[in-house]
Design a protein with these regions (language model features):
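Thiamine diphosphate
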Residues: 7, 16-26, 59-181
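Conserved thiamine diphosphate
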Residues: 2-5, 11-60, 96
Length: 181
C-alpha cells in the first residue's frame, strides 16, 4: 500500500488557532508522518504552493502523499509566476538576502510568513537573510547535492522554523544551526 498513489488532505496543521484548544495543536504529527516510509509530506505556505503540491501528489503514482494545510488565514507569499513547479524540488529560495547573506531561515507552512518577517527585521539591521520554503523534505532529500548546498550553505547560520517538534531538522540546520518549533 506504500507504493500506491493516495492523497490525504489534513487540516489544522499547527497551533495557529489557539481558540480550538490543546486538542487541536498537533505538535508531533508532522514528524510522525515524515517517519512513515515512502510517504511524501507536503506543508505548503500559500495557495500557489498548495496547487503545486497537489500537482506533485497527482504525478507521483508510486507513493502516497499528505497535504498538511493550515486553517488560519495566511498571506499570499508567491506573487510572481515561476516557469516551473518549485515545490517539485522540495525546497526553494523564496526570498534572497539584500545584504551579504549570513542567515538562512528554513520554514514550512504557516511559519514561512513568520520567517519572511524575521528576515526583513534582520535585513533592517544589516544582516543578510535568505528565506527557504521547504514544503516537502522527501523531495528535497532527492535533489542533487549541489542544489541542496546552494540553498543551505555551510557559511550561513541555518535556522529552521516549524510549529511542531524540532526533531529531524538538525539534518538541515547542522549542529551549529538553530531549530524553533
Amino acid at each position: 500500500i506504500q507504493h500506491v498513489r493516495s492523497i490525504f488532505v489534513l487540516t489544522h496543521d499547527s497551533i495557529g488557532l489557539g481558540e480550538d484548544g490543546p486538542t487541536h495543536q498537533p505538535v508531533e504529527h508532522l514528524l510522525s508522518l515524515r517517519a512513515i516510509p515512502n510517504l511524501a509530506v507536503y506543508r505548503p505556505c500559500d495557495v500557489v504552493e498548495t496547487a503545486e503540491a497537489w500537482a506533485c501528489a497527482l504525478e507521483d503514482a508510486g507513493r502516497p502523499s499528505v497535504l498538511a494545510l493550515s486553517r488560519q488565514n495566511l498571506p499570499q507569499l508567491r506573487v510572481e509566476a515561476a516557469p516551473e513547479n518549485l515545490v517539485a524540488r522540495g525546497a526553494y529560495r523564496l526570498r534572497r538576502a539584500a545584504a551579504p547573506r549570513r542567515v538562512v531561515f528554513l520554514a514550512t507552512g504557516s511559519e514561512v510568513a513568520i520567517a519572511c518577517d524575521a528576515a526583513a527585521a534582520l535585513e533592517a539591521e544589516g544582516i543578510g537573510c535568505d528565506v527557504v520554503s521547504m514544503p516537502c523534505w522527501e523531495r528535497f532529500d532527492a535533489q542533487p547535492a549541489d542544489y541542496r548546498a546552494g540553498l543551505l550553505p555551510g557559511d550561513a547560520l541555518i535556522v529552521s522554523v516549524e510549529a511542531g517538534v524540532t526533531l529531524g531538522w538538525e539534518r538541515y540546520t547542522g549542529s551549529a544551526g538553530l531549530r524553533f518549533g
